[in-house]
Amino acid sequence: LEQWADWIKKFPMKDMERYGWLEPEGTKEQKLNALLNFFGVSSPDSWDAVWRATNVAYRQTRRFRTTPEAVSAWARAAELEAEQLDFEVQDFDENRLRSLLGKLRNQTTEPAERFVPTVQELCAGAGVAVVWVPELPQTGISGCARWLADNKALVALTLRYKTDDQMWLTFFHEMAHILLHKKHRCFIMDNADQDLADNVIDPQMQREEEEANRFAEDTLVPPSDLHTFIQKSSFSLESIKQFSEKLGIGPGILVGRLQREEILGYNQGNGLKRKFNWTIGEKDSAAL
């Protein structure tokens, strides 16, 4: 048991307990067993074989220090959350998922209590489980896209940065990975609009990230519509609200796009963004 004491210490146990992923345990043996049960493995060596060897494409900036233990704990929590969905996840249907992009985009106008179940139901019908999982320390994660099986996918999101423009950009970024890129890969990202030049990734990963970024940006605000709005040269809050309503998206989504296009400063228009937070329930479970 003593040989695994250092392994146990590498996991953010307090946060995992606070979110209800682990029962608070006292002894080293209890903590070890709780971790093994959580991961569904028989030993730390088995964890190493299953989780450290997972083919993870992790877009990670140098600003964030991460550990495989924390990242794997978050990824496992997303798996378990997907198993508890209220909706049965059907076999993956690319055409159906593409046909739903407009409806999913329209959910950007809704509050969390309405868009969460709607997004989950729509995506489950196309073969994608969508879950929201609190970020753990030493992960720096905004979202993840991976395949649970050949015919079922998972998209998991945190509330990193806690604004609707970032959350929805991450959502459609991860959807792009599901629709455009290889199966049997796990795409974990830190920030959907981070400059790729700051990332340590190979050329193929960079192309995939750029494709996912462009897909997300253009799905939320089509280029022709963005051009039309920019040509008007009126970027007041009222103009943004009116044009967002015309597009059928939340005004914070347009603000975020204008900021990334350097038309607005990052200190402008933020009052139009919807902000999200986690609530910790009576049983220490996290909910959006």
Where are the language model's segments positioned?
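Active-site hotspot residues in diverse enzymes, especially metal/ion-binding acidic/histidine motifs
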Residues: 1-288
